[in-house]
Amino acid sequence: MKLSIEGIKDKKEWEKAGIKLPSYDVEKVATATKEAPVWVHFGIGNIFRIFIGGIADSLLEQGLSDKGITCVETFDYDVVDKIYTPFDNLVMAVTLKEDGSTDKKVLGSLTEAVKAQSAVEEDWSRLKTIFASPQLQMVSFTITEKGYALHDAKGEFFPFIKSDIDNGPDKASSAMACLLYTSDA
């Protein structure tokens, strides 16, 4: 068993292991989302993957949506390279229940992972395309003060914010600058 689009096609192995698979067509959802993104999320760590990703998965399972989430990482770009890309953006959600048993489920609602890194032209261009999409409806966040803080205790801009101001939109690095400069595409 491999957590990948190809791997989840062998449904019997996953069922035998007690792992629930999406009932929706993950590839179709990913394609539809890439063509017309409706939901972008900044900060794609553990809390996001299971809780917010779980909400999107539930909407897909109930037929209330036909699109997933475009995932954007602003801080730890290895998350995209090591957690999303190798597994085709699929996530294994494991919930520990009060009786000690677990529910295991593959989430297919996280359809694309993008680095909010202006130095990576392909990703930066993709973000601009996403934010120019007339179908985009929602932007959500699970970021800490590292992502939204602008000033230090003295009221001065943090060095990374000052750098964003000095260098302009083509070299944005902070979450807020990435949001500002890509949404102004």
Q: Which residues are covered by each model-predicted region?
A:
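Conserved small/polar residues in nucleotide/adenosyl-binding loops
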Residues: 181-185
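Intrinsically disordered, low-structural-confidence terminal and linker regions
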Residues: 3-6
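An N-terminal structural lobe/cap that precedes and organizes the functional/catalytic core
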Residues: 9-119
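Well-ordered mid-protein domain cores that form the structural environment of catalytic cofactors
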Residues: 74-180
